[in-house]
Amino acid sequence: MGLSYGLFICFLLWAGTGLCYPPTTTEDKTHPSLPSSPSVVVECRHAWLVVNVSKNLFGTGRLVRPADLTLGPENCEPLISGDSDDTVRFEVELHKCGNSVQVTEDALVYSTFLLHNPRPMGNLSILRTNRAEVPIECRYPRHSNVSSEAILPTWVPFRTTMLSEEKLAFSLRLMEEDWGSEKQSPTFQLGDLAHLQAEVHTGRHIPLRLFVDYCVATLTPDQNASPHHTIVDFHGCLVDGLSDASSAFKAPRPRPETLQFTVDTFHFANDPRNMIYITCHLKVTPASRVPDQLNKACSFIKSSNRWFPVEGPADICNCCNKGSCGLQGRSWRLSHLDRPWHKMASRNRRHVTEEADITVGPLIFLGKAADRGVEGSTSPHTSVMVGIGLATVLSLTLATIVLGLARRHHTASRPMICPVSASQ
């Protein structure tokens, strides 16, 4: 009876209440749960980028092959890993693998991507995974250190980064006296001041400070030619100002990436050519770097008989008197002649590199009137006075002749009256 009563109750509640039959659970082994840890882990280190990629990249349980993974536009390969390893590891320098860099107001941003590009295995022509690209980015504060080491993080890869991201453009131009515009005519009177402006166009780079490392004047665009006259030497000493010239760097700068200076014009003795070319070696450093003996702009001030820098500690110019600045302890011209010379640039031509040798010219000298008078030529003023004197003498002579002829004609035409005496 009890058994029949129980079966009757189950029949009434048969709609699936589970009162009589416990619910059954089935485990879906086809779609496992997603992994709890991320499949791509990026470490932005001081000068390195480390990327760890899970072989279960898509979380489906189907493992990717390390050979199908590359980093960056240059397709850098991962480190060698064993078959039992769960991850694939990349370790590259920040400026390698075609990584791009961008400078913002507060950060230096390196960007790249992880590429999964599956290829058929063996003789098969099918793929079981899709192509995928994962963007990767590392941000470094510009005004703080990213590690415990006392090294500026943005400067370690600076040179390579600069060349790969956007090259610098250097220029050297002749300017008007007010520095407001470029000089339209290259002509000068001897003794005039030539206003020169060196500049670098930095684009989106770290703020830079430009220096004129060396300048030389020659009769041709070849700065190794003879004769020559050194204007700037010893890594930024304007040595032309030591003579009777007033050549000097302009302080303060208008901008860190611009450096202006004046040079008293001159010509080479015992040479009939009235023109010169000026070639300068330009270079840059980070604007945050304090100027030193190798990176400076020093002028000699005759009133105090001392060297003064445009910026930085005053003692960085002391080496200008010794003629030995930096480790080499020799003239930049002499050390530069020891290696092949770079290609020359014509006037206003811009170079694209981290340093550049720029030539401006020719500067043509017309000379002064007083100089020509000393050399024995007749000045225009003297010629005019002589001409006026000759004209006056000629005019007086002609007037005398005309008056004489007129008087003679008048005398010939007058009737003669002779006195008659009466005889008685």
UniProtKB/Swiss-Prot annotation:
Q: What is its main location?
A: membrane
Q: Which residues lie on this side of the membrane: Cytoplasmic?
A: 405-424
Question: What topology does it adopt in the membrane?
Answer: Single-pass type I membrane protein
GO aspect biological process, one term: positive regulation of interleukin-4 production
Nucleotide-binding listed as a keyword: no
The Gene Ontology CC terms held by the record are: collagen-containing extracellular matrix; egg coat; extracellular matrix; extracellular space; plasma membrane
Signal peptide region: 1-22
What GO MF terms are annotated? acrosin binding; carbohydrate binding; receptor ligand activity; structural constituent of egg coat
Intracellular or extracellular location(s): Cell membrane
Give the disulfide map.
44-138, 76-97, 215-280, 237-298
Residues excised as propeptide: 349-424
Q: Where is the ZP domain?
A: 43-305
Positions of glycan attachment = 52, 123, 145, 154, 160-161
Q: Which InterPro entries does UniProt cross-reference here?
A: ZP-C, ZP-C_dom, ZP-N, ZP_chr, ZP_dom, ZP_dom_CS
For this protein, what post-translational modification is recorded in UniProt? Proteolytically cleaved before the transmembrane segment to yield the secreted ectodomain incorporated in the zona pellucida. N-glycosylated.
Q: TM spans, by residue?
A: 384-404
Which of the residues are on side Extracellular? 23-383
**Tissue-wise expression:** Expressed in oocytes.
Which key words tag this protein in UniProt?
A: Cell membrane, Cleavage on pair of basic residues, Disulfide bond, Extracellular matrix, Fertilization, Glycoprotein, Membrane, Receptor, Secreted, Signal, Transmembrane, Transmembrane helix
Q: Which family does it belong to?
A: Belongs to the ZP domain family. ZPC subfamily.
Q: What is known of its domains?
A: The ZP domain is involved in the polymerization of the ZP proteins to form the zona pellucida.
> What does the record give as the function of this protein?
Component of the zona pellucida, an extracellular matrix surrounding oocytes which mediates sperm binding, induction of the acrosome reaction and prevents post-fertilization polyspermy. The zona pellucida is composed of 3 to 4 glycoproteins, ZP1, ZP2, ZP3, and ZP4. ZP3 is essential for sperm binding and zona matrix formation.
Q: How does the record describe its quaternary structure?
A: Polymers of ZP2 and ZP3 organized into long filaments cross-linked by ZP1 homodimers. Interacts with ZP1 and ZP2.
Q: What is this protein called?
A: Zona pellucida sperm-binding protein 3
